[in-house]
């Protein structure tokens, strides 16, 4: 049953290695996304910013004055990438530690466009989904069969990374569980010692009280 669960988790990871969406933000708003990434894995972020036009009641391509500040932090909260890009672009980075990577985006707000409503189209691709195989085949002059073999090898490598990441998560969870159980045990022992000491003190106090009243 456990192996089936791990296999299902790996399939879901592969299926969700690429996602496309869009969201609305104001020009001073910050949006962050969490992506679980194995170590030594390439992540590519494609984005496009559109500006709301009240006259047409729709969104149009943003002006050159609007750009996006992109910041990426790894699972240790270290900054992997932080810079200002144009209103449309492609960003890539490689993870060096496994875990949750936080991708934050916000516009480089200016007084002219302050408070404007923006629509951001976002597409995040992880692992072998981030590889442009058409470009690889052209550069390396690969045949269709060679390209297919290359894709299969990359998929196997990505699955191996996902398995290693799942083991890493299991190890962290086990360590957290053991640490929690240990703390609960020591806390229970401490409570027991306190109760025993209080009981002993109460017995001594009652004995002294009865002796003072000459009841014993």
Swiss-Prot record:
InterPro entries: Emp24-like, GOLD_dom. The chain crosses the membrane at residues 183-203. Keywords: Coiled coil, Developmental protein, Endoplasmic reticulum, Membrane, Signal, Transmembrane, Transmembrane helix. Residues 204-216 are cytoplasmic. A motif (Prevents secretion from ER) lies at residues 213-216. It holds the Pfam family EMP24_GP25L. Residues 134-164 form a coiled coil. GO terms for cellular component: endoplasmic reticulum membrane. Residues 30-126 form the GOLD domain. GO terms for biological process: dorsal/ventral pattern formation. Residues 1-20 form the signal peptide. It is found in: Endoplasmic reticulum membrane. It is a single-pass type I membrane protein. Disulfide bonds: none annotated. Residues 21-182 are lumenal. Belongs to the EMP24/GP25L family. Eca and bai are essential, though not redundant, for dorsoventral patterning of the embryo. Specifically required during early embryogenesis for the activity of maternal tkv, while the zygotic tkv is not affected. Involved in Golgi organization. This is Transmembrane emp24 domain-containing protein eca. It comes from Drosophila simulans (Fruit fly).
